[in-house]
Design a protein with these regions (language model features):
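Acyl-donor binding region in acyl/amide transferases
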Residues: 245, 254-329
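Short amphipathic alpha-helix that is part of the acyltransferase structural core
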Residues: 191-223
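Asp-based phosphoryl-transfer active-site loop
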Residues: 19-35
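Short, contiguous acidic/charged loop-to-helix segments that flank catalytic cores in large enzymes
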Residues: 35-45, 90-92, 199, 217-221, ...
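Terminal substrate-recognition subdomain of acyl/acetyltransferases
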Residues: 105, 127, 133-190, 293-356
Length: 356
């Protein structure tokens, strides 16, 4: 048996901030018995409460099970659990390949996944193929809710409805696959409403959560606590802006954050981040151009810090696409500057609102 204590987790695993998705095996894990062999299977004790609690904490869940798809879905429907599992991988592929597919579909890093299985072979195969993933033996299911990595500091409104927001994303993706036309033509059908506002005290829990959860679309990787963000919010030398997005399928929630350090002659973007769920919606460009417009109106230079890592290449491209140029390198960090000569208009298909 592999225990949490016995795993020789690499540094990334030890330092990871939170689990975004728990992936369940089924036979002798989620339920007692083997579905295709036993006359009946029964849910593991307290499993429904565990699933509900993880869901309420904003931790997504999925399945990686070697089973017959139709039979398995029917059984999950009998138990009333189907709706809790996003992109379930029920097939005869390796567990590692199923986990890779789930990470790709959810657009999250492999190190944001925990995998639960009762079979030592399956756990070892995943550990070898995907060492970033946290592997948990089914015998330790009772301890999961007490693990720090499964306990976000705050449970926000966005946390509580995260699964529902992902379900809306699936509807959008299906609609996009079926749409005949250009990307812009499809985006125009969404009736997007994008709002940027000065962060209020009630936004800070979600703002902290964004800095902790967002790795791919984060320009510096900086994380800030609730108290630090509250200090920035009240500071005359900083602007803390938060962005939200909704469309005809529903709300994406609060999906973007910008921290600007304001000096008399120059502003510096210390942090720009957005949820991976809105990567293809063009809102990063709108956020940047809004800040550029503010800097122009205040007659200040606009700088931006960027700290590259193995995930945030897209944010580097976003800066370059918006006309930012490298003016300085300091160790691993890059300083960009924008001359504010080509501020792009908000696309006609987005209703844009600014709330001071």
């Amino acid at each position: 048996m592999i225990s949490i204590q016995e795993q020789d987790l690499n540094i990334k695993q030890k330092d990871k901030k939170s689990i975004k998705c728990v992936v369940w095996d089924l036979d002798n894990t989620l339920w007692h018995g083997v579905l295709l062999e036993d006359q009946e299977v029964s849910l593991r004790e307290n499993i429904i409460n565990l699933i509900h609690t993880l869901d309420n904490r904003g931790i997504l869940q999925s399945i990686a099970s070697k089973n017959d798809y139709a039979t398995t879905i029917t059984k999950l429907e009998e138990f009333g659990l189907t709706k809790y599992f996003l992109y379930p991988q029920i097939n005869w592929s390796s567990k590692a390949s199923s986990l890779q597919e789930i990470a790709k579909s959810l657009n999250i890093g492999m190190d944001a996944i925990a995998f639960i299985d009762d079979q030592l072979f399956e756990l070892e195969e995943v550990k070898f193929t995907c060492p970033e993933i946290l592997c948990i033996n089914a015998d330790e299911i009772g301890d999961i809710l007490d693990m720090p990595i499964m306990n976000p500091r705050f449970i926000t409104e966005d946390s509580r409805i995260r699964r529902l927001m992902y379900i809306s994303d699936i509807e959008r993706q299906n609609a996009e696959k079926e749409f005949i036309g250009t990307t812009d033509e499809f985006l125009a059908t969404l009736n997007m409403n994008f709002t940027i506002s000065s962060a209020q005290e009630e936004d800070l829990q979600r703002a902290e959560e964004l800095t902790l959860r967002t790795n791919q679309l984060n320009t510096t990787g900086y994380t800030y606590s609730y108290d630090e963000l509250n200090s920035f919010r009240q500071s005359e030398n900083h602007k803390l802006l938060i962005a939200s997005l909704e469309d005809k399928y529903g709300s994406y929630g609060k999906i973007g954050l910008i921290l600007i350090e304001c000096q008399p002659q120059s502003w510096t973007i210390k942090l720009l981040l957005m949820s991976c769920r809105v990567m293809s919606r063009g809102v990063g460009t709108i956020m940047l151009n809004h800040v550029m417009s503010l800097a122009q109106k205040n007659d200040v230079r606009l700088l931006a810090e960027f700290v590259p890592n193995d995930r945030n290449r897209m944010m580097y491209i976003s800066y370059k696409f918006a006309g930012f140029k490298e003016v300085e390198k300091n160790g691993n960090s890059v300083i960009f500057e924008n001359d504010l000569t080509r501020i792009q208009a908000v696309p006609a298909y987005v209703k844009f609102q600014v709330i001071d």
